[in-house]
Amino acid sequence: MSGLLVMPRILRCLNVSRISAILLRSCFLYGTFFGVITFRIERKDSQLVAINRRGYLWICLVIRLLASCFYGYSYDAWSGQYEDMYLRAFFGFRLIGCLICSVIILVMQFWFGEELINLVNRFLQLFRRMQSLTNSPKNRFGDRAEFLLMFSKVFSLLFVFMAFRLMLSPWFLLTLVCDLYTSVGTGMITHLCFVGYLSIGVLYRDLNNYVDCQLRAQLRSLNGENNSFRNNPQPTRQAISNLDKCLYLYDEIHQVSRSFQQLFDLPLFLSLAQSLLAMSMVSYHAILRRQYSFNLWGLVIKLLIDVVLLTMSVHSAVNGSRLIRRLSFENFYVTDSQSYHQKLELFLGRLQHQELRVFPLGLFEVSNELTLFFLSAMVTYLVFLVQYGMQSQQI
């Protein structure tokens, strides 16, 4: 009983926002180590700024090209041990998917490197403006929900090292390192999309909370203070100024989310397809060959967790954009101020057309329904494999 009473105190004392920021930093270092993130974050004039590193970019280019070439060259060596053509076809599709994602990473780093740097700086600027508007503490990211998602993501990133078995053969070690470097780079696309949409969701939630609590109280005061406006004009000016700031932030979040979607639309689709293919391949290999090892099924669970975390981050961002409509109508108060009405009409008109929806290549919507469809498809596929394996043994 005493433990149940102590647990809430521990959660209150635990600054989950700061821990989430530390976990986000660890994910950044993880992506930097595997050559996907080639910029650095520096503090200039008490502000965080993303700066490109051309030297490290070329180093990552050489390493990724060598790893991809050796990974493709060694395909015949390690896939020839399997006689099942279906399984070899799976390995071939995985090879093609990893190489395509590697090419996309190189294209984004070299041809869209400046756009990525500008996008990261716009994210950092939005968080600075949000912190200034809401007077929130520095070095924080989200709340308990974001902490749980970030903790699950870090666990998923670390689990990939447990799925590989080390052997003393130099050829096998070289093949393993190239496979790890290439496959982790492919998965980093999903991780970057997760962090991006989670950041958009945090921005929407913080701004919506500010509009719902503080800005609403300021706008309501316009009704009561409208008659005494001439005697005390400062509250009205402050409310209108904060309304302008909220308008700017909502519009900027929408523009940043659109730029993010345009950059990661195709990579996200290929990464999701690669995850589905990898799960089906590993499940087929484990069930039909009766290799129920922790490494194989743990890898399937890891890939499934990545997809679930991605859909949850997208869901938080989409819900934040949809909540704007209710908040905008709730903050519409009738006054005699014409400028106030013009700003609120602008507020209402813009936000009705800024709902966020994630459609990779326009083929499907990333949502919780996609997760349910994904789970049902996996269960059906696993049942089919079990039945197929049982019938094959009887024959």
Swiss-Prot record:
GO MF annotations in UniProt: ligand-gated monoatomic ion channel activity; taste receptor activity
GO-annotated cellular components: axon; dendrite; membrane; neuronal cell body; plasma membrane
Extracellular side: 40-89, 175-183, 289-293, 391-395
Tissues where the protein occurs: In larvae, is expressed in neurons of the terminal external chemosensory organ and of the dorsal pharyngeal sense organ.
Location(s), subcellular: Cell membrane
Transmembrane segments: 19-39, 90-110, 154-174, 184-204, 268-288, 294-314, 370-390
Protein family membership: Belongs to the insect chemoreceptor superfamily. Gustatory receptor (GR) family. Gr93a subfamily.
Described purpose of this protein according to its UniProt entry: Probable gustatory receptor which mediates acceptance or avoidance behavior, depending on its substrates.
Protein name in the entry: Putative gustatory receptor 93b
Species in which this protein is naturally found: Drosophila melanogaster
Gene symbol of the encoding locus: Gr93b
